[in-house]
Amino acid sequence: PLAPVGGGGVVLSGSSSAATLAQVAAMSAKHPAFAIGVAVLFSNKDKAIGEVLLWAVEKLKASPALIYASAPPEKVSEIQSRFGREKAGAVIEEAIAAIATGLAKSGVRRFVVAGGETSGAVVSALGVKVLEIGPQISPGVPATLSYGEPRYALSWKSGNFGGADFFSEALEALK
């Protein structure tokens, strides 16, 4: 097992795969959840990120939380046609990376991230360069621990990995 890191735990999701949508629904039923409005990110990204951070810091005092921009296919199509596919994806990734950085500054040390590009943006924003690979949480998805200070317990996945309770299982594995 990996060394414990302490600190709060959060799930950040930018994936809109079928598996991730089921995971978002399962996590939302058990824990506080904040849906990031993509249109709001385009109108005032800094304000939107600030609102998410205020909400999350308060909620994370009592429980893990979920912050997501995941949406069903028809909503994703609408967002992409309105803002452009690449631009919409980039804005979501930048926002989630900024949220991760803000949460890390507030003491969060356990991050579960859904979405390949989102995961890359978060790991980069947190300055993670080297990882210790820990036990498997789900096929193809291990728990990891960053080197350096502060240390982060991390799990990230591309969209269709894991069962419906993956987020809760991953948070438990990262304790």
Q: Which residue ranges define each predicted feature?
A:
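Active-site catalytic microenvironments in core metabolic enzymes, especially phosphate/sugar-handling
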Residues: 1-175
